[in-house]
Amino acid sequence: MIQMQTNLDVADNSGARRVMCIKVLGGSKRKYASIGDIIVVSIKEAIPRGRVKKGDVMKAVVVRTAKDIRRADGSVIRFDTNAAVLIDNKKEPIGTRIFGPVPRELRAKNHMKIISLAPEVL
């Protein structure tokens, strides 16, 4: 459950380390984003010589949330941290690697490139 002002870790090698959500896309009154949703983020911390720099405004896909995700079979999945992957306007990841596990709910939201780059799909 990501809302405005939420800080997230970046789960790719785009050069950003931490980002802050500044908008949840998908409707004018939408308050919260969950896994697979697209948000607008501001880069708060970045490494030198990365593809992005501090202060850049980008779009990102939420890949991990600390809030539970309930599945159709009744199981629940949750992560320790909130994390996102930076994307471009064509919804392709900016980085070439994804760090950490991602849930298979991303497949239903058509983020296949992120699924294929991830080392583990839960």
UniProtKB/Swiss-Prot annotation:
Transmembrane stretches, start-end: none
GO molecular function: large ribosomal subunit rRNA binding; structural constituent of ribosome
Entries under InterPro entries matching the protein: Ribosomal_uL14, Ribosomal_uL14_bac-type, Ribosomal_uL14_CS, Ribosomal_uL14_sf
Gene Ontology cellular-component annotations: cytosolic large ribosomal subunit
GO biological process: translation
Assigned keywords, A-Z: Ribonucleoprotein, Ribosomal protein, RNA-binding, rRNA-binding
SMART domains the record matches: Ribosomal_L14 (SM01374)
Function: Binds to 23S rRNA. Forms part of two intersubunit bridges in the 70S ribosome.
NCBIfam families membership: rplN_bact (TIGR01067)
Name of this chain's protein: Large ribosomal subunit protein uL14
Organism: Rhizobium meliloti (strain 1021) (Ensifer meliloti)
Gene: rplN
